[in-house]
């Protein structure tokens, strides 16, 4: 039985988040949390919350044993980007896109 946790509209680019997501794909839950705890990246903190949420969902909804859970699937999708304006010299302006992403984590035995 797989249990899912989805976090939508996270303020970090999908490309940066995928780098960390690749580290924990297929690992046991304890090992994944250990990797994320000691990773210095911002995405690691966000992914750790997502994995912990998936564990809590599995325990509460399915009555799963935490020791047997693995990160079966994890993927990061690009979400809507926020358009911002940055003033430049001589009355010009540049558009800045602030990236967001959706994170989906599935845990199962």
From Swiss-Prot:
GO terms for biological process: translation. GO terms for cellular component: cytosolic large ribosomal subunit. This protein binds specifically to 23S rRNA; its binding is stimulated by other ribosomal proteins, e.g. L4, L17, and L20. It is important during the early stages of 50S assembly. It makes multiple contacts with different domains of the 23S rRNA in the assembled 50S subunit and ribosome. Belongs to the universal ribosomal protein uL22 family. HAMAP family: Ribosomal_uL22_B. The gene is rplV. PANTHER family: CHLOROPLAST 50S RIBOSOMAL PROTEIN L22-RELATED, LARGE RIBOSOMAL SUBUNIT PROTEIN UL22M. InterPro entries: Ribosomal_uL22 (IPR001063), Ribosomal_uL22_bac/chlpt-type (IPR005727), Ribosomal_uL22_bac/org-type (IPR047867), Ribosomal_uL22_CS (IPR018260), Ribosomal_uL22_sf (IPR036394). NCBIfam families: rplV_bact. The lineage of its organism: Bacteria, Pseudomonadati, Pseudomonadota, Betaproteobacteria, Burkholderiales. It comes from Bordetella avium (strain 197N). GO terms for molecular function: rRNA binding; structural constituent of ribosome. This is Large ribosomal subunit protein uL22. Part of the 50S ribosomal subunit. SUPFAM superfamilies: Ribosomal protein L22 (SSF54843). Keywords: Ribonucleoprotein, Ribosomal protein, RNA-binding, rRNA-binding.
């Amino acid at each position: 039985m797989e249990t899912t946790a989805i976090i939508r509209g996270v303020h970090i680019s999908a490309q940066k988040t995928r780098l960390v997501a690749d580290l924990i794909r297929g690992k046991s839950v304890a090992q994944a949390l250990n990797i994320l705890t000691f990773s210095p990246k911002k995405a690691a903190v966000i992914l750790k919350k997502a994995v912990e949420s998936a564990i809590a969902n599995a325990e509460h909804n399915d009555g799963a044993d935490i020791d047997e859970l693995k990160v079966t699937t994890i993927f990061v999708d690009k979400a809507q980007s926020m358009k911002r304006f940055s003033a430049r010299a001589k009355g010009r302006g540049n558009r800045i896109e602030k990236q967001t992403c959706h994170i989906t984590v599935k845990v199962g035995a």
